[in-house]
Amino acid sequence: IVDAYLKGIGNFDPEKALEACVATANLDNYRGIGAYKELGYVPFNEKDSYNAENWSLSKTLEYAYDDYCIARMAEKLGKKEIADEFYKRSQNYRNVYNPATSFMQPRDDKGEFQKDFKADAYTPHICESNGWQYFWSVQHDIDGLIGLTGGKERFAQKLDSMFTFHPSADDELPLFSTGMIGQYAHGNEPSHHVIYLYNAVDQPWKTQEYVAKVMNELYLNSPAGLCGNEDCGQMSAWYVFSAMGFYPVNPISGQYEIGTPLFPEVQLHLDNGKTFTVKAPAVSKENIYIRSTKLNGKPYDKSYITHEQIMSGATLEFEMGKEKVTSDQ
């Protein structure tokens, strides 16, 4: 709803839509929302008739993002009081971060973190994922998450561990943990934005490496071409965005993080009559690294492009190569 409103898509009453969003976010007897509002998180020992699955940790993180979306819409509509309330609520992700383990962790209604927590375990407190996969679900405040983790260097190390800490041969993974690269599960949507977070710590070549790996190895022209459940079209949406060379880590931000393109040229013919073009003439399975970028013929050094740039009919050009370009080059 908020993404559509901010992009001017859809014929609906934004005031009524905001009213519905706020009402839904304040259903105190539904899926732990009352406790979330009171404590700042959904406790794992919360019981209610709508909370059969538990999923307390993942709910807390998703509610925080939902709150941020409501705040953005309220701010755009000039509803300062609502915006302030929900921006504050959007920081609730901090309440489930345990500095002792450096993971998001379930808490009970007394504030105690779950004992014997294992980040690679699949528990009832996290929806179809584990602690590694849901740690990064703070799409609205990546800088804040980096700060919690201890800065860019520590955050980059944790990302590296995500992709290199492989399940053991004896681990029995659930059905939804497919397309695994370390603890990253491309077959399950909560992981999908994580590859692009290397941009936030000034290591875009790692984003480029992993995006290319996933596109070339986990999407195949065969009956088993998708490595996981298509859930609402997200597996395909990730591929379409990534193949063009960018991806919306935070969908309502209006920004698309740059990855690595798959095709020498892509054109988007827009409803406003303009055409957005992505060019990467030297791209290949070997030439996956972006050596330089131009936007409308001028050097461009940002790690993202914006919705406005796309809709203006801009031309994005990538010089590709087989050698990575690191931050010290």
State each model region's role.
Residues V2-L6:
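Active-site-adjacent, His/Asp/Glu-enriched structural segments that form or flank metal-binding
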Residues G8-Q91, N95-T277, A282, E308, ...:
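Active-site core of glycosidic bond-cleaving carbohydrate-active enzymes
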Residues D271, L295-K298:
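Short strand-turn-strand beta-turns centered on an Asx-Gly dipeptide
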Residues P281, K298, G321:
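Surface loops and adjacent helix of pleckstrin homology
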Residues E286-S292:
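Beta-strand-rich binding/interaction modules
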Residues G297-T306:
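Solvent-exposed beta-strand/loop surfaces of large extracellular or lumenal domains
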Residues L316-K324:
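Conserved "repeat-terminator" motif of extracellular CCP/Sushi domains
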Residues V325-Q329:
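Short, basic, low-complexity termini and linkers enriched in Ser/Thr/Gly/Pro
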